[in-house]
Amino acid sequence: MKKIIIKATCISALLLSTQGWCGNTSVDLRFGHNTRSDVNYSRIKVMHQANNGFYFSVEAAQNHNDTFFGDTDRYNPDDKGLTEAAQEIETRWRFDLGNGFAVAPGMVTVFTASNTHYRPFIQGWKAFDNGLNLSARYRYNTVNDAHSDKELDGSGYTRRQSHQFDIWFAYNIGKFGMSYNPRFRWQDNVDQGTGDDTYWEHTVAFNYKLDDGWTPYVELVSLDKTYINNDGNHENDYAVRLGIVKQL
């Protein structure tokens, strides 16, 4: 009897553990175009939200240069067609606090051809009964390159150690959803790609849930002074992104 109880306990623990890791798995395919810099890119992302609060995603980003699916030009080595940009892994563990509140620590790791980025974060949520959802996140961005970013005083290069703040306002009405995400990034006296030590980004997104787990969406993005014109001055860039999510 004792052996049976032990076996039953082990099997129950295994089943509970397995059920906890079950959840929703989705694939997200997105294409984007920056209007002022005339850049094309895409991203494919696989996400899993487990029932126990654990979230995991992997994604691969590609640059498409002059065309979305152009090949490399053998006579022009600068025209590389479709090229790999980066791979990203995100993990977080969400804890429900009750009354619509939740919090999650997490980590984003980005792999590029030249270095690896580490981005630990803490994120919180508040869901309301009227369909409104609020979320806020603080993220610390660093990289394994001691000379990754340019100092504004002209003294040289230093390691990226920037502070990033995001807020999401999301609202759902039936199958229709919309969101607004302002983002702010700062590192004292270090160029954020804007000619300044600050960076702002604003994203407005709309989505619509179709049958069989399909959800198309569009994102309209303002990128703070990341485009450098012919005179060497920084100007805002703008992006249009079209994507679709399929829940498996």
Residue ranges and their predicted role:
Residues 1-26, 248:
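Cleavable N-terminal export/targeting peptides
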Residues 20-74, 86:
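Short glycine/proline- and aromatic-enriched beta-strand/turn motifs that initiate or cap beta-hairpins
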Residues 24-27, 52-58, 96-105, 130-136, ...:
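Repeated loop/turn-to-beta-strand initiation elements of outer-membrane beta-barrel proteins
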Residues 31-35, 60-66, 107-113, 138-144, ...:
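Transmembrane beta-strands of outer-membrane beta-barrel pores
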Residues 38-42, 46, 83-89, 116-120, ...:
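Residues that define the transmembrane beta-barrel architecture of outer-membrane proteins
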Residues 48-50, 93-95, 124-126, 169-173, ...:
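Residue-level signature of outer-membrane beta-barrel architecture
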Residues 117-191, 200:
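Detector for outer-membrane/organellar transmembrane beta-barrel domains
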Residues 208, 235-248:
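Outer-membrane beta-barrel "beta-signal"
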